[in-house]
Amino acid sequence: TASSAVRRLAGGAIMGSSTAWFLTENPDFNGSVLVIERDPTYECAATTLSNSCIRQQFSTALNVRVSQFGADFVKNLRTYLGGDERVPALGIRNFGYLYLADSDAFAQTLRDNQRVQLAAGAATELLTPDQIKARYPYYNVDDLILGSINTRDEGYFDGSTMFEWWRRQARERGVEYVTGEVVALTSNPAGTRVESVTLASGEVIACGQLVNAAGTRGAQVAAMAGIALPIEPRKRY
């Protein structure tokens, strides 16, 4: 069968559901949204397995500001979601990430990055080995030159709850979720736009636009459109 809508999202975990939510939140958007998710239990999704960590120690101002918006969204989730009293209050468990330099080159990178971060409004501190030892006496700092840490809006949060409420509100606003695995994409003759997706069931779904929100499988979906996307799943320890 074939059907038509404005937006199709391949992947329904936190990236797909947040995209669907933000589309429906935009007053200029009057289309329809369909989310295609291969596993509606999300048992093995990166969203489910993630520690939901957030940081601001980046080398570009844009990344810092994106993270700051994310932190504000977490801390004011109920407000962003329209004051819905069902939405719980969330916060960030601040502990900060400590980056350690054992070479002059990496120490200079930390200094350069701190300038970018401070200019963007982050609270990054640079620590000498003695300062690191004073804060963390159990560390051996003999081979260290410099440390970098930010303990404001840097730590972890309850990402599962945020995901659940993005998804719940998206569905309440008319976003449709279907179970299926995208196995092929069909592009227009010029190869500039995806016109339809084919599911493992054989169903063909027409697209106005397709959003690749497949997470660690994003490279596989992109390859169906002839795009080499440098995404690969890696286990974090």
Describe the predicted segments one by one.
Residues 220-237:
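Glycine-rich beta-alpha-beta "Rossmann" dinucleotide-binding loop(s) and their flanking helix/strand
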Residues 20, 24-25, 169:
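Gly/Ala-rich phosphate-binding loop of Rossmann-like dinucleotide-binding domains
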Residues 149-209, 213, 217-220:
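Helical element adjacent to the flavin cofactor pocket in flavoenzyme catalytic cores
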Residues 105, 136-145, 187-196:
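A short, glycine/Asx- and small/polar-enriched loop/turn
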Residues 15, 19, 41, 217:
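Conserved Rossmann-like nucleotide-cofactor binding loop
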Residues 51-135:
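Dinucleotide-binding Rossmann-like beta1-alpha1 core, especially the glycine-rich loop
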Residues 2-15, 34:
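Beta1/beta-strand and adjacent pyrophosphate-binding region of the FAD-binding site
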Residues 24-47:
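Glycine-rich FAD pyrophosphate-binding loop
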